[in-house]
C-alpha cells in the first residue's frame, strides 16, 4: 500500500489549484489522480477567453489557464497519475484505483481533496426524446468534437438554450 499526505482526485481546474495551494502551504507529499490522459479537465475544451483574470491578471482561454497551473506544478514535486480510475474512497481515507500503468492500487492518505468537477447530464436526464437522436449533441460534447478532436458537428447548427454555454457555442460556431 502506498502512503501519501494528500491525494487529489481530479486534475481539472479545482484539482490543479488545490495542488498548487497545498504546495505553496508547505505540503510536499501530494498525488493527483486523473482519469483522463492529460491534466486540465473541462478547461481543455473551452477555447473562449474568460479565464485567469483574477488569478493571473489577464484573459486566458481554458487550455491556456490549465497550462499555467500545469507549468506551476512542474516546478514542484507534486506527483501525477494520469489515466487512473478511482474506484472507491473509504472512510479510513484509503483510495482504491486502477490504471494500465500502475495496475490496482490502494493509496492511504492523510487528507483527500475531491476535485472531480462535473459532467453534463445525459440525453435521457435532460429529456431529449427518442431512442437515438442522430446529430443531437450536448454543448460539452460539441465543444469537445470541434475544439479538441477537429470534427464538424454539422453543416447547419441549431443551438437550443441561451445560457452562457449556448452563447459561447454560438460564438465558436461562427468561427
Positions of predicted regions on the chain:
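FAD-binding core/adjacent interface of flavoenzyme oxidoreductases
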Residues: 1-9, 67-156
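Glycine-rich Rossmann-fold phosphate-binding loop(s) that bind the pyrophosphate
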Residues: 10-14, 161-163
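Gly/Ala-rich phosphate-binding loop of Rossmann-like dinucleotide-binding domains
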Residues: 19, 23-24, 170
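Glycine-rich FAD pyrophosphate-binding loop
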Residues: 24-44
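Glycine-rich flavin
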Residues: 37-39, 43-45, 49-59
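Short beta-strand to alpha-helix junction loop
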Residues: 52-71, 160
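Conserved small/polar residues in nucleotide/adenosyl-binding loops
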Residues: 173-174
